[in-house]
Amino acid sequence: HCVIIGFKLSNSTEKTLFEYEDINGQPHVTRAQNINPYLVDAPNVILPSRADTPRGLPQLIKGSQPTDGGHLILTDSEKEELIAAEPNAVQWIRPYVGGVELINSIPRWCLWLKGISPAELRAMPKVLERVKRVTTARTESPTKSVRDFAAQPTLFTQDRQPTTDYLAIPEVSSANRRFIPIAFLTTQTI
């Protein structure tokens, strides 16, 4: 959250930043030389908006998205329970990493059913039940493109899975970090 308390037409020598670890707690008060447009004590440097990747550099893309009502995503315990009940499911389970998981080292998994045959799916009733719930969730979506994907419940609605190992960079991090968290992931990680 950001709240700007006041503006002045004249340049005041007294500038103050208030930061809250807990919005209900007491602020950390910092005297500032200058409060820039990014609301930090730094010179007024404004980064230009850029839609294109600088020439010669690979393009950053958003990762794959299931839009599945959560039914293709598994916690550690759900993964273990599923494999115990249906050992053949192990070949269809992949690590699934979003920004929160990357930053906090939280393990999460997904059912990556790309290429699964109807016979293989029917042989795993618990996986099939999850797929049916994906169909229901997508059918009830207010978004037409998601409803259209109800006919393909085994697939992510947005499949941007790289064919080579890649760098994963969270879309949102924190200005309090000295470094941007980045992970080198294999093609097996969604």
Q: How would you name each of these model-derived features?
A:
Residues 24-190:
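Polybasic, glycine- and aromatic-enriched phosphate-binding surface used to engage nucleic acids
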Residues 2-14:
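Conserved beta strand-loop-helix elements of the APE1-like EEP
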